A protein has these predicted regions:
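Ser/Thr-rich, Proline-interspersed low-complexity disordered segments
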Residues: 35-113, 120
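N-terminal Sec-pathway targeting helices
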Residues: 2-15
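Active-site segments of SGNH/GDSL-like serine hydrolases
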Residues: 232-236, 249-281
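Loop/turn elements at helix/coil->beta-strand transitions in domains of secreted/extracellular proteins
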Residues: 138-141, 224-230, 256-263, 288-291
């Protein structure tokens, strides 16, 4: 074979090789089978196939890749759901404490002139109450020290048995109930004709109930175990001002030493011929800083000072109906009402109940 013939054969072989390689590249580089097969036939005939371009040396040129910007497939981003804070359950509004009752005066006399308990008295009385509570005094009991003006049935007993009508003074009803059982009790320290000195005399104590050498006041405190002691004396202490003062102070000292709150009450009469004994009672209450139940201020407003024909004992009022104007003209009616007022004040302001 001549050299010329050999050269021609090599050229033909080279062309065949190039064509074969180009065909293989076309098969490899054509669109993906999945997408092409899925496309409709019409789409495959959309345009002529571009001729294969050959580069130098007869090798077909590789197609320049077309940069297709990546299609941003929208990834479904979960919209943040704002988790609501738990709804605050409103706290129940505290039930407002009942407003303290507005005390009512009597017959135009201001409450503060009848029940004398300024802050220093309340503070001192709380100390006495605390001492009594520590040794077991009964906060629901009170006792009486007095003469015939404080005997049953006229003094306080109706508040144990009924009927009664407090009317405008109905705010006192809780105090009635708190001290139930003491109102109508026969006190060992209440006797007809009792003086301040006989209240401290063991010979006036109740036989069989009281211990040897025990005074009526001491005996009553031991037997009834009260937290409060109402002291209503002075009518029978005539012409003995100095002794009345010292005897009353002895009763007050006995009560305080026993952890019992002494409450001093004034009287409506002028049996001693002046108002000396009431002045003494007021002075003792101030000196000891203990509650003063100044009934005498109300007696000033009553016809005949609320006294019976003997000018010593009070006139009675059986009905105990404080809606009846007659009640406000009678000694025992006002005596009982104001005594209940001072018990209420001690209970609320000192005992804290």
């Amino acid at each position: 074979m001549t050299l010329r013939t050999l050269t021609i054969v090599q050229g033909i072989l080279a062309v065949l090789i190039v064509v074969t390689v180009s065909a293989m590249f076309w098969i490899v580089l054509r669109p993906g089978q999945g997408a092409a097969q899925a496309a409709p036939a019409a789409a495959l005939r959309a345009g002529p196939v571009a001729p294969v371009a050959f580069g130098s040396g007869g090798v077909p040129a590789l197609p320049t890749p077309t940069l297709v910007p990546p299609t941003a497939t929208a990834t479904a981003t979960a919209t943040p759901t704002s988790t609501p804070y738990p709804t605050a359950t409103p706290l129940p509004s505290p039930t407002p404490a009942l407003a303290p009752p507005q005390p009512v005066g009597v017959n135009g006399v201001p409450y503060e002139a009848i029940i004398v308990m300024p802050p220093e008295v309340v503070a001192r009385t709380k100390e006495i109450f605390a001492a009594g509570k520590a040794i077991g005094r009964n906060p629901r009991a009170y006792s009486k020290v007095g003469d015939s003006t404080t005997e049953n049935p006229h003094f306080m007993a109706r508040f144990d048995t009924g009927p009664y009508n407090l009317a405008a003074y109905s705010y006192l009803q809780p105090a009635v109930e708190h001290f139930l059982g003491s109102h109508g009790r026969d006190s060992i320290a209440v006797r007809i004709g009792l003086h301040s000195w006989t209240a401290n005399d063991p010979t006036w104590a109740e036989p069989g109930l009281c211990l040897p050498n025990e005074t009526p006041v001491q005996c009553e405190i031991r037997v009834h175990n009260p937290a409060v002691l109402l002291i209503r004396l002075g009518t029978n202490d005539v012409g003995a001002g100095g002794m009345f003062d010292s005897n009353l102070r002895q009763i007050v000292d006995t009560a305080i030493a026993a952890g019992v709150i002494p409450v001093i009450g004034t009287k409506g009469d002028r049996h001693e011929g002046s108002n000396e004994n009431n002045d003494i009672l007021r002075r003792i209450a101030a000196d000891y800083r203990i509650p003063l139940w100044d009934y005498d201020r109300v007696a000033d407003t009553l016809p005949g000072r609320g006294l019976d024909v003997d000018a010593a004992h009070m006139n009675t009022y059986y009905a105990h109906d404080y809606a009846d104007p007659t009640a406000f003209t009678r000694g025992h009616a006002m005596h009982n009402l104001t005594a209940l007022m001072v018990l209420d004040a001690v209970w609320r302001e000192v005992m804290g109940e």
